[in-house]
Amino acid sequence: MTRLLGGRIEVICGCMFSGKTEELIRRLNHVRLARQRLIAFTPRRDTRYRLGSLVSHNGLSVEARVIDSIRDIPAYLDSDVDVVAVDELHLLDDPPDAAREVCQQLADRGLRVIVAGLDQDFRAQPFPAMAQLMAVAEQVDKLYAICVRCGAYATRSQRLIDGKPAPADAPTIVVGGQELYEARCRACYEPAQ
């Protein structure tokens, strides 16, 4: 067990299908190779795959605790934990500042905190919790997908309803995969009306 001096916060962000969970799992595999103790968390809202696992679109997985709030995390930690991972942060039902506060407290205890999530909603507006966390993180990695329309780098998540862009007044959070979302570049993204 090797705890990082001072701890740190790492954020992995990007649009749908950009490989955020895959990158998180890759980092957690390195943590295991270093014989560090980790604990991973996933939101109860994420019902796309197996509850209790971080699962990437390509099928990689890691066991995870299911939580409703970022504030649930400290109750699961003991003194042996070195690394805390949270996938799909934007799906947690918390005030925007809760993620920043909890992650900073964990990093201040000397833990490495790795968080993955969407940086923007389907309207191309920032998810407030992710934006706040990115501002205080030691490392922010923005990943991109490939635009399904033109093949350029995609940074937007286009939500579709019957093949058309979702209206601006649609709910911000709708859990889904390729049946509801497409990765699109700035030029091909159609703003919600």
Swiss-Prot record:
GO CC annotations, alphabetized: cytosol
Keywords: ATP-binding, Cytoplasm, DNA synthesis, Kinase, Metal-binding, Nucleotide-binding, Transferase, Zinc
EC class name: transferase
Record-listed E.C. numbers: 2.7.1.21
Signal peptide: none
Catalytic site: 88 (proton acceptor)
Binding residues for Zn(2+): 147, 150, 185, 188
Subcellular location(s) of the protein: Cytoplasm
Pfam families hit by this protein: TK
An individual GO BP term: DNA biosynthetic process
Domain of life: Bacteria
Reactions listed under catalytic activity: thymidine + ATP = dTMP + ADP + H(+)
A GO term for molecular function: zinc ion binding
Binding site for ATP: 14-21, 87-90
This protein's record includes keyword Nucleotide-binding: yes
InterPro entries xrefs: P-loop_NTPase (IPR027417), Thymidine_kinase (IPR001267), Thymidine_kinase_CS (IPR020633)
Chief location: cytoplasm
Subunit structure: Homotetramer.
UniProt xrefs under NCBIfam families: PRK04296.1-1
Sequence similarity: Belongs to the thymidine kinase family.
Protein known as: Thymidine kinase
The species this protein was found in: Roseiflexus sp. (strain RS-1)
